[in-house]
UniProtKB/Swiss-Prot annotation:
Coiled-coil features, chain-numbered ranges: none
One example of a Gene Ontology biological process annotation: photosynthesis
Annotated compartments: Cell inner membrane
Gene Ontology annotations for the cellular component aspect, listed alphabetically: photosystem I; plasma membrane
The protein's name in its UniProt record: Photosystem I reaction center subunit XII
Complex and partners: The G.violaceus PSI reaction center is composed of one copy each of PsaA,B,C,D,E,F,L,M and Z, and forms trimeric complexes.
Entries under InterPro entries matching the protein: PSI_PsaM (IPR010010)
Signal sequence region: none
Sequence similarity: Belongs to the PsaM family.
Membrane protein topology class: Single-pass membrane protein
Membrane-spanning ranges: 11-31
Keywords assigned by UniProt, alphabetized: Cell inner membrane, Cell membrane, Membrane, Photosynthesis, Photosystem I, Transmembrane, Transmembrane helix
Length: 34
């Protein structure tokens, strides 16, 4: 049970990090485009 919770948390953290990185890249490309 504990291992499942830990892996789930790692997946959630990785997802959030990827989401933030994607948004940052989008904003950066938009700023450079202008």
């Amino acid at each position: 049970m504990a291992a499942t919770v830990v892996s789930g948390a790692q997946v959630a953290i990785a997802f959030v990090v990827a989401l933030i990185a994607g948004i940052a890249a989008l904003l950066l490309s938009t700023a450079l485009g202008k």
